[in-house]
Amino acid sequence: MRESPRIRRLRSDFKALEKLREESSILDFEVASTTHDAPPESYAITFRGRGLWRADSSADVLIREQHVVHIDLGAAYPRMMPDLAWKTPIFHPNISGSGVVCLGGYGTHWVPSLNLDELCGMLWDMIRYKNFDVESPYNREAALWAKSQRAVRLPVDNRPLRDRIAGVAPTKREAARPPTTAVPMRKPEIPDVLFIDGEEVVEAEVVGSSNEDILFIE
């Protein structure tokens, strides 16, 4: 029997995600059980990389290195946007505390040609703060933080999703290290000396001296 356009699209998305998983040390996924040879309609996507979160009782913004998003490809997909639900703590202007994800213009004007692997690329860029919008936030506190903070360099993870293709995937030894899931993003210590020479910024180190009137710079 000839497959419907939707089934063909679901099958194409599944193959694209399998290929993406081969090309990325960041992404993995699980699928809901399917009947017979039907392609998956529901995914639990796991991203392993640096993102940010903040506990409700704390003012500290923390690093988190594992993120899970559920993606449900409803009956109207790909004509309509998939249902997205964030399942792990995250601190981002465009993701609400309850896990609702804002994709900007895609939320009101969904593009059926946007494939599932491309959507995962967008989600990864949100996690690492390469992509965020502070003007129409779902999390106002995160938007205010993103606009005013100067302590954290963004994006917090420089790797593209297809990091194996880009040649920046971690080595086996690095990958074996336990993930850092809650490291306080504290303000860095005040730099010793910062010289500005034209457009070039040069860091210098202050070396202690027994004479308080003398400051050595290396």
Tell me what each language-model feature is.
Residues 1-65, 76-218:
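UBC/E2-like fold recognition across ubiquitin and ubiquitin-like conjugation systems
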